[in-house]
Amino acid sequence: MKKPLAYRMRPKYLNDVIGQLDLVGPTGFLTNCLSQDSLVSIVLFGPPGTGKTTIAEALANSMNCWYKKLNAVSITKQEINDTIEECKKHESAIIIIDEIHRLPKDKQDLLLPNLEDGTFYLIGATTANPMLALNPAIRSRTHLLEVKHLTTDETIIGLKRAIISPDGLDNKRKYT
């Protein structure tokens, strides 16, 4: 059975991302990080369904470094500690935390020493206002980047891409 269309069409690298020009356009913040091979810790915030987690994974894939994706809702302290230990085995590592606003303060605090010493880069994704929802110590060590809804034109680009892509509909249907 095929996976859902949205899953199959999910961007794998930054240059696959549609829209978000402030982040991934020619002079976008993340594009500059990638071109300079210089990653920083970030928190992507914005409405649900805008691609925050997808952008996080696309950035990690584009940086060609080890990464682990965690969900703040279900993560345990042991999983955080195990992930940090795994990061220490890699020259460059990223921890992606989805729904980071749901990560309790004591678990956020576990990240701080290794975030400070460069053991890993943090990419958080949240629908909440990071100024209110995140530990000030985490906020001060990350760049806060807003992810916005796609414009109508950007949505049309995505639909056209899905229609012609072999991973999408592969031109098997006619649309008028």
Regions of interest found by a model, annotated:
Residues 2-3, 32-70, 85-86, 112-113, ...:
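Walker A/P-loop
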Residues 65, 135-149:
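A short helix-turn-beta junction within AAA+ P-loop NTPase domains corresponding to the substrate/partner-engaging
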